[in-house]
Amino acid sequence: MTHKLTKIVITGGPCAGKTTAIERVKLYYQNLGYCVLVVAETPTEIIKSGITLEEFGKIPFQKAIINLQIQKEKIVLEALPTKLNKDVIILYDRGIIDHFIYVNQTEKTNIEEALNIRRDECYKNYDAVFHMCSTAKGLPNLFFNTECRKEPVEEALKLENLIKKAWEIHSFYYFVESELDFEDKINKLIKKMNEYIKN
């Protein structure tokens, strides 16, 4: 019996709640009997490994992130058993497209050539994209930074808009607005995800 594989990106600007949402979504679908795999956020891994934007420069830094993202996505797909008795959902904490928003057009082309990829082909890696709105947009009083995220609100807003512009051309793109109660935001995300998966 062939079981369904659904590949979903959860993206969004700084302080959108992506990582927390992914943990909640993972648990929700595991409880429904799905096999749920997660491709963790790559920039955080790169930064914690010691490769920083300040020391390595923008292009080597972004190229390292994109290259690792590509490898992680391949590994997860290759690890899937050929015979599995349940449907599979792969959750991506941001996708390849996200990592191109930090460089200009010439730099994008150079990275594509160096890694032998095409951005427009990368959209096909994912079945659906759920964009969680950054609290910087609409709820700036709830915005905060972390060890690996240090953008001011203004920069976070700029990134939010770039992410939206980059992803909204995907064949299934859904924008999840911020809510005062984060539970409402999570519930809205899961509701829309259910509609997509069960369609």
Give each language-model segment a name:
Residues 26-68:
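Conserved substrate/cofactor phosphate-moiety recognition/catalytic segment
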Residues 18:
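Conserved lysine of the Walker
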Residues 21:
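Hydrophobic positions on the alpha1 helix immediately C-terminal to the Walker A/P-loop
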Residues 102, 106-168, 177-184:
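A glycine- and Lys/Arg-enriched "phosphate-lid" helix/loop adjacent to the NTP-binding pocket
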Residues 10:
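Hydrophobic anchor at the beta1->P-loop junction of P-loop NTPases
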Residues 1-7:
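Phosphate-binding P-loop
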Residues 14:
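The conserved Walker
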Residues 51-91, 95-96, 100-109:
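Conserved nucleotide-sensing/catalytic segment adjacent to the nucleotide-binding pocket
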